[in-house]
UniProtKB/Swiss-Prot annotation:
Protein name: Probable transaldolase
Pathway: Carbohydrate degradation; pentose phosphate pathway; D-glyceraldehyde 3-phosphate and beta-D-fructose 6-phosphate from D-ribose 5-phosphate and D-xylulose 5-phosphate (non-oxidative stage): step 2/3
Gene Ontology biological-process entries: carbohydrate metabolic process; pentose-phosphate shunt
GO annotations of cellular component type: cytoplasm
Keywords assigned by UniProt, alphabetized: Cytoplasm, Pentose shunt, Schiff base, Transferase
Superkingdom of the source species: Bacteria
Native organism: Clostridium botulinum (strain Kyoto / Type A2)
Major subcellular location class: cytoplasm
Active site: K83 (schiff-base intermediate with substrate)
Catalytic activity of the protein: D-sedoheptulose 7-phosphate + D-glyceraldehyde 3-phosphate = D-erythrose 4-phosphate + beta-D-fructose 6-phosphate
Function: Transaldolase is important for the balance of metabolites in the pentose-phosphate pathway.
Family stated for the protein in its record: Belongs to the transaldolase family. Type 3B subfamily.
Length: 217
């Protein structure tokens, strides 16, 4: 399973990229607004850091305007993926953009049927939201598994991006459920790298070395 980072914070993206684990980035209007910067400016800087799919979301909810925004955003860089919300207008926009060779990521997916419609409209990616489904008592990972099974049975090439990831366990569950990608906040990526026994082991190695050879420089 590939790892994307879910943020518009360039410094977080830079730090995660230095780990050598990133395959792409997802952003949304809320994340861009949090940074207080121009969308195009942020997206262009992200593209200079990560050589992989970069999802940038349209703002409009009318399909003609979605198409216009999508076309403009796609001109920024070859790696741009147009992120479009799951709705009737969004599906129409995805259908048009995909026929023009523009990659799309249909977001705010909360059911396998929504994912099927998005895939058949031509979406490159679908993004089911684990955490938000969990919040309403509907295990998000079950939806991811349904989508993965359905896509496999019907040989659908659309890739699944597990989104609204809040914990390392979400990442593990997504990987085991068959998600192609998980888009993960920076803090969760760092949490994934840690384990109490690793810290204890490192401390013991250092103490043993210092005992045998003196303090390391």
């Amino acid at each position: 399973m590939k790892i994307f980072i879910d943020t518009a914070n360039v410094e977080e993206i830079r730090k995660a990229s230095e780990l050598g684990v990133l395959s792409g980035v997802t952003t949304n209007p809320s994340l861009i607004a949090k940074e207080g910067r121009d969308l195009k400016e942020v997206v262009e800087e992200i593209c200079s850091i990560v050589d992989g799919p970069i999802s940038a979301e349209v703002i409009s909810l009318e399909y003609e305007k979605m198409i216009e925004e999508g076309r403009e955003l796609s001109k920024l860089h070859k790696n741009i993926v147009i992120k479009i919300p799951m709705c009737e207008e969004g599906l129409k926009a995805v259908s048009v953009l995909s026929k023009e060779g523009i990659k799309t990521n249909v977001t705010l997916i909360f059911s396998s049927m929504q994912a099927l419609l998005a895939a058949r409209a031509g979406a490159t990616y679908v993004s089911p939201f684990l955490g938000r489904l969990d919040d309403i008592g509907n295990p998000g990972i079950e939806v991811v598994k349904q989508i993965a099974d359905m896509f496999k049975i019907h040989e659908i090439k659309t890739e699944i991006i597990a989104a609204s990831v809040r914990t390392p366990m979400h990442v593990l569950e997504a990987a085991m459920a068959g998600s192609h990608i998980a888009t993960i906040p920076y803090k969760v990526i760092i949490q994934m790298s840690k384990h109490a026994l690793t810290d204890i082991g490192i401390e013991k190695f250092m103490k043993d070395y210092e005992k045998a050879f003196g303090e390391s420089k």
